Swiss-Prot record:
GO CC, any one term: chloroplast
Keyword RNA-binding among UniProt keywords: yes
Molecular function, one GO term: RNA binding
Annotated source species: Argentina anserina
PANTHER family documented for this protein: MATURASE K (PTHR34811:SF1)
Name this polypeptide is given: Maturase K
Gene name of the encoded protein: matK
Signal sequence region: none
Role description: Usually encoded in the trnK tRNA gene intron. Probably assists in splicing its own and other chloroplast group II introns.
Sequence similarity: Belongs to the intron maturase 2 family. MatK subfamily.
Subcellular location: Plastid, Chloroplast
Chief place where the protein resides: plastid
An individual GO BP term: RNA splicing
Key words, A-Z: Chloroplast, mRNA processing, Plastid, RNA-binding, tRNA processing
Length: 500
């Protein structure tokens, strides 16, 4: 019981300074401006970086001190959209600044955790590819898996409530509520494709969404890790984390939710989350996976008021199932090896069956992505990039080389690279056709005139691609992961990887 109480009191004991006064500090907006200049290439440039100045910031702060109007009245929000096409610079600036302020508690928690554990910071710079060695170690020993789509909250208030454990400043939460209430529809459904935050303030939206996912996973994994210490009897679960230990102490006196859930233990359950999805895998029977499925559905419904249909969560055998994971088509492939054994004068052959994680390059989705951005047609035949024909030759070649290098870098861990070479061929020929179109010539004539050295930059050897080597996280394996495949210096996923 004490372990439960200590776990939850840890969040209570974290005291931070008030965040609300920071919104009146000029340095916050300067920091947001600097981050905007260095933002990822995947985020749209909304024009805020070019128009921000110290004079505008001071004018914004003076306007916020007004008592009658916070920024712009609700009646004017239709003409000056908060996340529209930059018609309201003040609203955009304050939302960028507020996103920086909300990140402060998370940054302080990360720094304190690194100082307490004395963790080498370079080990925390792992890329997304560091997930694959974990799958290689765990998944071949499992039998069933479910690809689960993490549901989005229906009500924006749920996103605000998930921050109440890390932000001890009620004024900041009220300010966030004011943003959402003043400029958005309260009942708007947040979806990954049509999010209200998608174009303008991705930083704030991602922070809210990641907080929501972190809240969901922290409760789920906490219950999972502590399941071995609980009796296998049915009981009513308190999902409110600050009152969970009360349920352990008083199992009969208090009832919060009417639904009775069965808690069960499975020492072989594995959980991986990525891009708004999660994979739940187990070595046990399909019956236990079915229990986990209905447990997740009731968990989302009771705690986050999110309805998810159980029929959309499918349980698949890993031998017969390929799942799309971070742009790769991953599956468990049996590898049979013949071993000859000899005992005295008798010798015999044994078939040794080993399971191996197979990661394939997604050829068809990648061709569809290239066709969408006009590098080829739907059949994979290269075409010229007409929108780049006005650029200089060096810029055209540089852009194609950069795209090909990023794809080669990202998919260098593929089990079979023949499909990757086909994509690189499409990019090379599309580059040549674009140059030939610019110079009003044919591909054959253009290559004959300039020679084969034009495209030498495309033929970068895979061994020359920079890779980061880190030791495995598993304590049972002390050796370095020697294959230069998964530990790469990739910090984000290119748009071409998002096939959906």
């Amino acid at each position: 019981m004490e372990d439960f109480q200590v776990y939850f009191e840890l969040y209570r004991s974290q005291q931070h300074d008030l965040l609300y006064p920071l919104i009146f500090r000029e340095s916050i907006y300067a920091l947001a401006h600097d981050r905007g200049l260095n933002r990822s290439v995947l985020l749209d440039n909304v024009g805020y970086d070019k128009k921000a100045s110290l004079l505008i910031i001071k004018r914004l702060i003076s306007r916020m001190y007004q008592q009658n109007r916070f920024i712009i009245s609700f009646n004017d929000s239709n003409q000056n959209k908060f996340l529209g096409y930059n018609k309201n610079l003040y609203s955009q600036m304050i939302s960028e600044g507020f996103a920086v302020i909300v990140e402060i508690p998370f940054s302080l928690r990360l720094v304190s955790s690194l100082e307490e554990t004395e963790t080498v910071k370079s080990y925390n710079l792992r890329s997304i590819h560091s997930i694959f060695p974990f799958l290689e170690d765990k998944f071949p020993h499992l039998n069933y898996a479910s690809d689960v789509l993490i549901p989005y909250p229906i009500h924006l208030e749920i996103l605000v409530q998930t921050l109440r454990y890390c932000m001890k400043d009620p004024s900041s939460l009220h300010l966030l509520r004011l943003f959402l209430y003043e400029y958005y529809s309260w009942n708007t459904v947040i979806t990954p494709k049509k999010s209200l935050f998608a174009k303008r303030n991705q930083r704030l939206f991602l922070l809210l969404y990641n907080s929501y996912v972190g809240e969901y996973e922290s409760i789920l994994l906490f219950l999972r890790n502590q399941s071995n210490h609980l009796r296998l009897t049915s009981f009513r679960i308190f999902f409110e984390r600050i009152r969970f230990y009360e349920k352990i102490k008083y199992p009969v006196e208090e009832v919060l939710f009417p639904a009775t859930l069965w808690f069960f233990k499975d020492p072989f359950i594995q959980y991986v989350s990525y891009q708004g999805k999660s994979i739940l895998a187990s070595k046990d029977t399909p019956l236990l996976m079915t229990k986990w499925k209905y447990y997740l559905v009731n968990f989302w419904q009771c705690h986050f008021y999110v309805w998810s249909q159980p029929g959309r969560i499918h349980i698949n055998q890993l031998f017969k199932y390929s799942f799309d994971f971070l742009g790769y088509l991953s599956s468990i492939r049996p590898n049979i090896s013949v071993v000859r054994s000899q005992l005295l004068e008798n010798s015999f052959l044994m078939n040794n069956l080993m399971k191996k994680l197979d990661t394939l390059f997604p050829t068809i989705p990648m061709i569809g992505s290239l066709a969408k951005v006009k590098f080829c047609n739907t059949l994979g035949h290269p075409i010229s990039k007409s929108s780049w024909a006005d650029l200089s030759d060096s810029d055209i070649i540089g852009r194609f080389v950069r795209i090909g290098g990023n794809l080669s870098h990202y998919y260098s861990g593929s089990s079979k690279k023949k499909s990757l070479y086909r994509i690189k061929y499409i990019l090379r020929l599309s580059c040549v056709k674009t140059l030939a179109r610019k110079h009003k010539s044919t591909v054959r004539t253009f290559l004959k005139r300039l020679g084969p050295k034009l495209l030498d930059e495309f033929f970068t050897e895979e061994e020359q691609v920079f890779a980061l080597l880190f030791p495995r996280t598993s304590s049972t394996s002390k050796r370095l992961y020697r294959g230069q495949i998964w530990y790469l210096d990739i910090l984000c996923i290119n748009d071409l990887v998002n096939h959906e």
